Amino acid sequence: DYYFNEDGSYDPTQKRPMIALTFDDGPGEYTETLLDTVEKYNIHVTFFMLGQNVEGRESTVQRMVQLGCEIGNHTWDHPSQTLPNMDLDSVVQEFQKTDDELVKACGQAATVCRAPYGAITEEQMAAVGKPFFMWSTDSLDWKLMDADADYNEIMNSDLSDGSIILMHDIHEPSVKCATEKLIPELVNEGYKLVTVSELAAAKDVTLQSASYSDFWDSSLQAGRVAGYAGNSSDSADSSDGSESSDSTDVSDGSSDGSDVSDGSD
């Protein structure tokens, strides 16, 4: 966590900037390769997993836990319709089935969730009872399907301390981008790569059953936490056309109760 100035001198007043890398839809055949790099660089990332993909890859999930990564829930089977169009019991069951499978695989349920397409209502979040995470940077890896293009898309975005990056560990080019280019470069630039919960804790944010998309200082200073889902037209491009371009408003959990566009994943 030490911070050094450009001249190499130690600055005790500063902390290393942090970014949370998140990976959806796994585990898959490339996840172990990603974990090799996680171990090599001694970093932590968050995996938002589909319950149906956990069975048969229990050892991979166990390794995630052993390496200090965060276990996230992305529903059982990524239903084709957005969660707001489903009844409440069905939505809760999507997450509960996945938690049950995760407990069988690694002895623990997910600590955080991400809704398919990023779409979920305040009532549904409350019923699931866990923090939900959006993202501030979409790699568009589902669309680009090229490691170099994925890397350029991410690095040309507004990355900064508190950013949350969306990727998918089910795509080989995405994992190649992360392992060969993105992770080495972010570490080289001085970023500490952490889980979403570690990022929240570092920013003194107590997570609630609400939706979060970043922990930028500007967001925190604007009073947008807890529950700020900041993917709007003037922030990150949050579309994931591999799944849907639909967007559904979710409550931001702030005192004014205003809604913000959730984007999609």
Feature annotation, model-predicted:
Residues 2-6, 10-11, 41, 54-55, ...:
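C-terminal domain-boundary segment and adjacent tail
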Residues 23, 49-52, 73-75, 114-117, ...:
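A cross-domain feature marking catalytic cores of carbohydrate-active enzymes
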Residues 61-63, 87-89, 148-150, 207-213:
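Short low-complexity, flexible loop/linker segments enriched in glycine and/or proline
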Residues 114-115, 130, 183:
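Hydrophobic alpha-helix-in-membranes signature
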Residues 217-265:
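Ser/Thr/Gly/Pro-rich low-complexity, disordered linker/stalk segments of secreted
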